[in-house]
């Protein structure tokens, strides 16, 4: 039996079994030996050969959430999950694993949340009440391991401590939350500019354009195709003149070519096999080698390549295929799952590194299977350093794969989804699962990535519009499509559908200051931007079954329509809720019918900053805006921590508001625009406060 040590710091318990060599070191500051035993932590540990098995009891009314990107219900009970990054193209509901492995789950028992994070990048298996009805069983294929027990009592408390341990999310620039367009692939460069011009002429605000692999010369990284993109600097300048950013895809495969500079400069920094020879595989450029990102010197070299690439004016980097994938070895998913006694039907082929690949981590040689899931984390880390090396204040990295800590460096999107009504619902489950696993900056391919190669594909315009609507408040907002897929850019739709998408995109921009305020909150505290309802109402068991609505921060509930219908029933949690579209105030813990295509409800006690220096205030609360201005509302007063400009103030109140007084001097009349809604046009800087007359903000 290996030795077991337990350390503790501020409600985080580190359990060390044997002498583990973790894939990444997450130091527990001021760690002290804990007096708590495993039994007091509610755990049992069994060692079977080269495996460690950790068990905890599972109560009937207990909820298990987290585990990252899983194509299942958000309450993870009665299923077994595998942590093993794969290229999961055209995935479906109930297929596992996918691209991202976050070995963190949160138990909510009797209203109290506790987190369990296993710092292993190997094929960890979580059995949540499947093999044993009353147990959670975690199997780690190593004889030594470290894991953490994180006390709540709120889900939010667990995520704050988890991100304190694994790293707070980076703060992207505001443009990164705008509307992006992408395709596999846009070219030549004149057509890229022409498309942007068409979009802007039709009134679509495009924040960024993504270039897929066809911009490269023979798919070689850090090159431009000589005919498709003969003047890349001109392209970048033309886009920047239009206030549009350029993001280029960068895979992890370096072409074997004696005349190719990155191959020559990278010698000694690529992955090897056990014999010490280079691991030579296949990827888009053909015969390929792969950077060993676990090596510090490799990360330094890669950061230099990224920095040089960015020096042209490229604004962002899109990391793809980084599970990591290699085309020379395709295995059946059942081989990945071979150790599991129960398997769901899944006939996928996945492309992975061979078993004999090795890496060098902190000077030690380790097998690929022991650290596989952390490969994209180290790639993102090196890419992030490339931005720092180039002295960029604005950092944008998008990654398909990830491991615990990826939030420090990158956005995550849910990969190559398939346009269908089932997928529409699944995307919300996936992004919410990532959000409550410490990855706040998430999104999906709007419109579904796959082209016309699958029978279940639905290319209807109604579904495309619903994708745009579903993702209205997703932190990452990008349409993307395969080479043989329809055009998902809305300018190519008939006017009726084009205008629908335009309304959705404009509404997103209207709420962008609120979304970006939540991004600041995420970077400071580790809170998710979008959340399942149970995140805010964790002691209400009913909320754990609501998976087609989501909270945007604490204050906004959005209920996208994820069916062919044009209306839907909306579950409102306890409290009072303001219908954004008609001003109705509704008592919560109720189910209401919404006939609006974009059902939005504001929670009592909310402050919502909007585009154009507008504010919505509903009840008593406080809020930190993206520019660090603190706004506080009391019964008859709104205070500002510093001088800010306000163009329009919307006050939600069940009692009439007749006028406001700005900074004890200027009196402004208030107009009632719809029920419970009072609007004051201010158009000036406010030094300190606004007083309300004729009503109070506090609801009776």
From Swiss-Prot:
At the top of the EC hierarchy, this enzyme's class is hydrolase
This protein's GO CC annotations: cytoplasm
Do you know which SUPFAM superfamilies this protein is assigned to?
A: (Trans)glycosidases, Galactose mutarotase-like, Glycosyl hydrolase domain
Catalysed reactions, as listed in the record:
Hydrolysis of terminal, non-reducing (1->4)-linked alpha-D-glucose residues with release of alpha-D-glucose
Listed A to Z, the keywords are: Cytoplasm, Glycosidase, Hydrolase
Q: Where is the active site?
A: 320, 323, 416 (proton donor)
* Top-level division of the source organism's lineage: Archaea
GO MF, one term, reads: carbohydrate binding
Q: What induces it, per record?
A: Expressed during growth on maltose.
Q: Where found in the cell?
A: Cytoplasm
- PROSITE patterns hit by this protein: GLYCOSYL_HYDROL_F31_1
Q: How does activity depend on pH?
A: Optimum pH is 4.5 for maltose hydrolysis, and 5.5 for glucogen hydrolysis.
Q: Which NCBIfam families match?
A: alpha_gluc_MalA (NF040948)
Protein purpose: Major soluble alpha-glucosidase.
Q: What's the name of the protein?
A: Alpha-glucosidase
List the top taxonomic levels of the source: Archaea, Thermoproteota, Thermoprotei, Sulfolobales, Sulfolobaceae
- Gene name, Swiss-Prot/TrEMBL: malA
